[in-house]
Design a protein with these regions (language model features):
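Charged, terminal alpha-helix-loop-beta segments
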Residues: 1-186
């Protein structure tokens, strides 16, 4: 597989993706009956995930090979691996080259799948990025037409403005060392 994206999900879990399609995760897992954890690899696409062991290593190799053979721009559109999660594929391309959308966006401060809360509701922003002046930009990606996009954009922007006004992005490790513009604050 030529291009593997590695994403940190938590201090104990790392994701492996091909053009946005997660095919494996490495994690520390608690062992039953004690407080110790042990590393394990989980592979497959939900809901068909399984823990890697000696009995299914060949299946893991076949999965990686088959995804790598079809998940690229010229791949066969009828393949399930090619069609799966088109918005994640688009997101992976945008994050790799955020300046293709706008040359004022700063690739050093580009984050994907950023949680945004409002009361008890949790949403995931596809891409949150700072421009060169420190102003925040929300990028919401759609693989298909969506009549709700304008309302979703307003909702996400209000969430981002609220988090920014309270300094929560830096508090949770986003934009570390980057001074964000106060113009974003409501």
């Amino acid at each position: 597989m030529p291009e593997v994206e590695v994403g940190i999900l938590s201090p104990a879990e790392v994701s492996f993706r091909c053009h946005g399609l997660e095919f494996a995760r490495a994690r520390l897992s608690a062992k039953p009956g004690n407080f110790r954890s042990a590393p394990e690899i989980v592979f497959g696409a939900a809901p068909s995930e399984r823990v890697l062991d000696g009995g299914n290593f060949a299946h893991f190799e076949r999965l990686i090979r088959s995804i790598g053979e079809v998940r690229h721009a010229e791949g066969p559109g009828e393949s399930r691996w090619w069609r799966l999660h088109p918005e994640r594929w688009l997101e992976s391309l945008v994050v790799k080259n955020i300046c293709a959308l706008d040359d004022q966006l700063d690739p050093r401060w580009c984050y994907s799948q950023v949680p945004a809360f409002s009361a008890s509701d949790r949403a995931m922003i596809d891409v949150l990025v700072s421009n060169r002046e420190g102003r925040l930009a929300v990028v919401e990606l759609k693989a298909d037409e969506d009549i709700h996009l304008p309302l979703q954009a307003v909702d996400y922007w209000s969430r981002v403005a609220s988090h920014h006004a309270r300094g929560e992005f830096q508090k949770f490790g986003y934009f570390a060392g980057r001074e964000l513009s106060p113009q974003n604050r409501s």
